[in-house]
């Protein structure tokens, strides 16, 4: 056992890591990556031990000042000792071997994720095992319920409360910025909680954060939705299904989104936010999570079945995901395009308008605000009339932002136009490569970074026409993005004659 004094560090240390001078552990049974229990007179937490030669003095233990739910004081003496390996580790190994987990075993895994007893390595093992081995319906139900139970829940006076959610995978998927105000303007309650980017260049929360606050508490979500009918908040700012946000932080560098976790993540948040029914958008196409209509139908069936078991009505919509939605990819570019669509929907990209209006139409029909088959028409009328823009501005102001015009959005100061190498037609836009390109430019952390598409699939182009423009706040990032673009060709241009063959 070690007795050390707390030294706060201005570092966000993952897995509750603690840093100890190597002199304090020399000749002991303590090694880097050991799981340790840190105990004070008032609290305790599990951490991962890291050693240093100079960052921390002998006799001190470095602790992140950003660590949550732990009340320590600078200079306070704490005890550091080995912690027992969590029960979850054996259950994770069981799933790695392809076995089915019981509800109690899944509950233990979720509980230990929330209490941060698992290291990122152990959590990664769990995610990869579910990605490869999968889960049956009973396992997913158990995981979903426990994820919701371990956090806060929101109760509503006015019913029904509706929601729309996209499983993502398509660059520029900014539909919610139009769909939510359309539905709210029709008199329905739609409190939307969104994630930040996981595998994409920008999540809805990243995009809206350019012009308003998205870090709302449960009470603020209720207040905004009660006042305006809707809200657009970051789910990670509240304690709704807290295991989900911990898992997302591990999924992000792995660039994976296991289907069992996808199902549980979406539906746990719906339980926690008190949703009566939801519409799930499932993009289908090359380069997204769901490759074809058959896979889309299978996932939709799982969502609907899971909803029935959880008491939430679910309808799924398969949408075209073969190329980016609209022309803007990246937080600032996307909010600019969404604002332009709200101000003048007739001049906005058809893909953005059609998707936003279609999803809103389904919700309006489910909520009785439009007759079956007329929802899309009613949604378009709300958008065209300016009521959706008015409602969007209400939501923005109520969340702490200011009314912003499209031309007021600042974009990255460093830009580069990528031009067509020849005459021809755009035969394809790679969702994956466009997303990677936007990330090379700095997305999502650099909100001014991104890609603006000058063309879409099927467009005729001449040599030297602009295919797309890269934006970044960093000249170095821009150079990296340009080099990536020239190596990978995210947009393909072909002539009518693809290849000439004479003999083999």
From Swiss-Prot:
Q: Which Pfam families match?
A: Glycos_trans_3N, Glycos_transf_3, PYNP_C
Active site, renumbered: 257 (proton donor)
Keywords recorded for this protein, A-Z: Glycosyltransferase, Transferase
The keyword NAD appears for this protein: no
Query: Does the UniProt entry include the keyword Glycosyltransferase?
Result: yes
| Gene Ontology biological-process entries | AMP catabolic process; pyrimidine deoxyribonucleoside metabolic process; pyrimidine nucleobase metabolic process
SUPFAM superfamilies listed in its UniProt record: Nucleoside phosphorylase/phosphoribosyltransferase catalytic domain, Nucleoside phosphorylase/phosphoribosyltransferase N-terminal domain, Pyrimidine nucleoside phosphorylase C-terminal domain
Q: Look up the EC number in the record and give it.
A: 2.4.2.57
User: What's the protein here called?
Assistant: AMP phosphorylase
């Amino acid at each position: 056992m070690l007795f050390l004094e707390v030294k706060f560090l201005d570092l966000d240390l993952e897995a509750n890591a603690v840093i100890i001078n190597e002199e304090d552990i020399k000749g002991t049974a303590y090694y880097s990556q050991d799981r340790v229990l840190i105990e004070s007179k008032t609290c305790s937490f599990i951490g991962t031990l890291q050693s240093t030669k100079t960052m921390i003095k002998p006799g001190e233990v470095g602790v992140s000042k950003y660590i949550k739910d732990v009340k320590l004081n600078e200079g306070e003496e704490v005890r550091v000792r080995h912690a027992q390996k969590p029960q979850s580790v054996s259950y994770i190994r069981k799933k790695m071997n392809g076995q089915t987990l019981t509800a109690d075993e899944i509950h233990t895994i979720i509980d230990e994720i929330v209490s941060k007893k698992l290291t990122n390595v152990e959590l990664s093992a769990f995610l990869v095992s579910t990605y490869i081995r999968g889960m049956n319906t009973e396992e997913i139900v158990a995981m979903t319920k426990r994820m919701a139970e371990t956090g806060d829940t929101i109760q509503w006076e006015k019913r029904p409360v509706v929601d729309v959610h996209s499983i993502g995978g398509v660059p520029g998927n900014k539909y919610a910025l139009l769909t939510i105000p359309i539905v709210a303007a029709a008199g329905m309650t739609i409190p939307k909680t969104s994630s930040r980017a996981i595998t994409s260049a920008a999540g809805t929360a990243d995009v809206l954060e350019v012009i308003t606050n998205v870090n709302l508490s449960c009470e603020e979500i209720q207040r905004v939705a009660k006042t305006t009918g809707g809200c657009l908040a970051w789910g990670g700012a509240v304690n709704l299904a807290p295991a989900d946000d911990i898992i997302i932080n591990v999924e992000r560098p792995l660039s994976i989104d296991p289907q069992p976790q996808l199902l549980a993540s979406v539906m746990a948040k719906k339980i926690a936010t008190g949703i009566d029914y939801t519409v799930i958008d499932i993009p289908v196409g090359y380069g997204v999570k769901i490759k074809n209509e058959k896979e889309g139908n299978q996932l939709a069936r799982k969502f609907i079945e899971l909803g029935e078991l959880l008491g939430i009505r679910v309808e799924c919509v398969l949408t075209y995901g073969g190329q980016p939605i609209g022309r803007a990819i990246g937080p600032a570019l996307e909010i600019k395009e969404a604002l332009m669509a709200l101000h003048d929907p007739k001049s906005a990209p058809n893909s953005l308008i059609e998707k936003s209006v279609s999803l809103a139409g389904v919700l309006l029909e489910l909520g009785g605000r439009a007759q079956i088959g007329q929802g899309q028409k009613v949604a378009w009328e709300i958008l065209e009339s300016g009521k959706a823009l008015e409602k969007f501005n209400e939501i923005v102001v109520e969340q702490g932002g200011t009314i912003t015009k499209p031309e007021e959005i600042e974009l990255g100061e460093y830009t580069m136009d990528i031009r067509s190498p020849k005459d021809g037609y755009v035969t394809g836009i790679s969702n994956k490569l466009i997303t990677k390109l936007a990330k090379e430019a700095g997305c999502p952390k650099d909100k001014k970074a991104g890609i603006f598409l000058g063309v879409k699939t099927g467009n005729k182009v001449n040599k030297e026409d602009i295919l797309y423009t890269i934006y970044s706040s960093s000249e170095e990032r821009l150079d990296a993005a340009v080099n990536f673009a020239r190596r990978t060709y995210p947009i393909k241009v072909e002539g009518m004659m693809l290849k000439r063959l004479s003999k083999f």
